[in-house]
Structure formats: structure tokens, C-alpha cells
From Swiss-Prot:
Pathway: Amino-acid biosynthesis; L-proline biosynthesis; L-glutamate 5-semialdehyde from L-glutamate: step 1/2
Annotated ATP binding sites: 10, 169-170, 211-217
Protein name as catalogued: Glutamate 5-kinase
Subunit structure: Homotetramer. Dimer of dimers. May form a complex with gamma-glutamyl phosphate reductase (proA).
């Protein structure tokens, strides 16, 4: 084994159930064995687990429920305790304690809450406890949900300061086409940058019991790689897959980390789900992308959503393409009022000012 590393392992519902309606406990036992072996060798392991809704449905005897958010939250509330109990029981066989962390998007949007979550996660790791993370599905609304555990795992990897992120799924990795319908599809072993062409071939491999697909795994890989974290998509059914990843053995698809990782503050900006959106003109787009400039109010064409000063927002060009994320110096109402105006007019319009820029370049990261 190499020197101690931190690995985040994301386990999708399809991996935990084997595509069935119930948790595949024998397979979960094997995955825990692999993690425990790495833990004993001095590595730090973080589990991001799906399966709460599937566990709840199984525990209640597969009830016929309406396809509503309330029904899913009911199942998650029942299943979450069953799921963490299972992880606790299995890791305890190896004398390893686990600690549960339930997160929502709000924990990532607010800088203070982000730092608190980071400190809690790292404290667990520092005390040789395996964090078991899931989204708080029992209470999260659409407005505060991360939305899928692929993206949640990327955020967890950032919080943990991970070296590697392993996304285990029911596919061997990313293919040139959907291997279920195209026998000519080839496994892509190495990716050095995610572009539109790669997103176009990602397809959709959603399990009937889960909420993620290959496209969300690409999103997660993009976030993690830009934060300096190697990301691997591999089949959870492959024997010894977790140990192989830590040994550097080629499995699945490896997304190579960005050579110059983001600094800590920009990791938060990149990982935080945007609280709102602004559209900018061609001049502002060029200034941001080509010259690395701050965004001035003059370049803003429209503001979407309601957000506070200090929240992360999405910056889009006139075609609607996401070009950058950044921390807004003004709230949404103020930006609507000063949009299209010169910076020297801000004080006259608002009666106050927080500086001449809407989003400073030091608080911005291009996509």
C-alpha cells in the first residue's frame, strides 16, 4: 500500500440492491470487508450511501404508495435508520465505528455551514471513524436538495479533502455509447477533461430504484477533478474493486484530476449549488472568460431567483450557457436595480454600495 490516502466511496442504489427490490446484504458485506481492509492499512474511508428509500420500502413490506414527495420522504425516514444500522453492524465486525452525516444543499450554500460540515467530517476521520453520508431525504425539499448522491459524493470529497472519489455503479464505467443497446460500445479508460462531446455520450442509466444516471456521475467527476480529486467510475460488482482503486490498478473509467487544483475558497464556490442566476452580455462574457475580470453591473442583462448578498450564483451568457459561478456582492433585488448601470451609479440608485463589482474575480470560478 502507498501512504495513507482519503477515499470517498459512493454506493448507488443499483449497487446496494443488485437491481432487485431489496438490499443485497451479502454484497454489502463484501464491500465493507474491502473498506475495512483499507482502513486497517491506514487509509481514511468515507461512505456516501444511497438506498434509504429502498430500505424503507423493504422494511414496510413494499407498500403501494402514491408517487409523491411525501411518500418518498416517508420511506426515507423509515429506511434511513435501517440503513445506518446495517452499516454500523457490518463495520463493527472489524472493530470500526461509523458516524452518520445527513446533508442538504443548504449545508453547502452557506460558507459557515460548509466549514462546520467540513470540520465535523474531518474530526470523524481524525478519530478513525468511518463517516456514512446521505442526503437528508426525509426533510429536504426540492429547494434544498442536492438532488442525487453522485453530486453529493463530490461535495463530500471536497469536504474531506479526499485524494480519490470512487463512484460504484452497475456499469463498468463510461462507454462511447450505451453498452446495453450498442454492442460496439467501448469502455473509455481515461478522461483528462469533460467537454460537451463527452456529456452527449453519457446517456442515462437510471435504475428503477435510484435517482442518478451517468450524466450526474459526469457532473460529480467534473466537480471533483477541478478540486484536484481523481475520480473513478467502476462496477460495484467487480471483485476487489475498492482495493484495486487504492492500489492504482486500472478499473473502469479514470477521470484525472486537474493539475492545478482549486484553492479552498474556490472549492466551496465550485461545489455550492447556485442560489440564483444572472445573465450577462457578450462584453461581460468575454471579460470573464478571456481576461479573468470581475463582473460589473453594467454587463448584467437579467437576474433570476431570490438570493442574499454572499450567496453563490450562476453566471450565464446570452445563449444560456453556464460560464461561471461566483459569490454575489449584492442581493438579487439590488442587482435587478443596478443591472445595466455603471458602477459609479450604484450609490445613487441603492443609497449604499459594497464596491463597484457585482461578483469579484477572486470570488468567481469559470466553468
Amino acid at each position: 500500500m502507498s501512504d495513507s490516502q482519503t477515499l470517498v466511496v459512493k454506493l448507488g442504489t443499483s449497487v446496494l440492491t443488485g437491481g432487485s427490490r431489496r438490499l443485497n446484504r451479502a454484497h454489502i458485506v463484501e464491500l465493507v470487508r474491502q473498506c475495512a481492509q483499507l482502513h486497517a492499512a491506514g487509509h481514511r474511508i468515507v461512505i456516501v450511501t444511497s438506498g434509504a428509500i429502498a430500505a424503507g420500502r423493504e422494511h414496510l413490506g413494499y407498500p403501494e404508495l402514491p408517487a409523491t414527495i411525501a411518500s418518498k420522504q416517508l420511506l426515507a425516514a423509515v429506511g434511513q435508520s435501517r440503513l445506518i444500522q446495517l452499516w454500523e453492524q457490518l463495520f463493527s465486525i472489524y472493530g470500526i465505528h461509523v458516524g452518520q452525516m445527513l446533508l442538504t444543499r443548504a449545508d453547502m450554500e452557506d460558507r459557515e455551514r460548509f466549514l462546520n460540515a467540513r470540520d465535523t467530517l474531518r474530526a470523524l476521520l481524525d478519530n478513525n471513524i468511518v463517516p456514512v453520508i446521505n442526503e437528508n431525504d426525509a426533510v429536504a425539499t426540492a429547494e434544498i436538495k442536492v438532488g442525487d448522491n453522485d453530486n453529493l459524493s463530490a461535495l463530500a470529497a471536497i469536504l474531506a479533502g479526499a485524494d480519490k472519489l470512487l463512484l460504484l455503479t452497475d456499469q463498468k464505467g463510461l462507454y462511447t455509447a450505451d453498452p446495453r443497446s450498442n454492442p460496439q460500445a467501448e469502455l473509455i479508460k481515461d478522461v483528462y477533461g469533460i467537454d460537451d462531446a463527452l456529456r452527449a455520450i453519457a446517456g442515462d442509466s437510471v435504475s428503477g430504484l435510484g435517482t442518478g444516471g451517468m450524466s450526474t456521475k459526469l457532473q460529480a467527476a467534473d466537480v471533483a477533478c477541478r478540486a484536484g480529486i481523481d475520480t473513478i467510475i467502476a462496477a460495484g460488482s467487480k471483485p476487489g474493486v475498492i482495493g484495486d482503486v487504492m492500489e492504482g490498478i486500472s478499473v473502469g473509467t479514470l477521470f484525472h484530476a486537474q493539475a492545478t487544483p482549486l484553492e479552498n475558497r474556490k472549492r466551496w464556490i465550485f461545489g455550492a449549488p447556485p442560489a440564483g442566476e444572472i445573465t450577462v452580455d457578450e462584453g461581460a462574457t468575454a471579460a470573464i472568460l478571456e481576461r479573468g475580470s470581475s463582473l460589473l453591473p453594467k454587463g448584467i442583462k437579467s437576474v433570476t431567483g431570490n438570493f442574499s448578498r454572499g450567496e453563490v450564483i450562476r453566471i450565464c451568457n446570452l445563449e444560456g450557457r453556464d460560464i461561471a459561478h461566483g459569490v454575489s456582492r449584492y442581493n438579487s433585488d439590488a442587482l435587478r436595480r443596478i443591472a445595466g448601470h455603471h458602477s459609479q451609479e450604484i450609490d445613487a440608485i441603492l443609497g449604499y454600495e459594497y464596491g463597484p463589482v457585482a461578483v469579484h474575480r477572486d470570488d468567481m470560478i469559470t466553468r
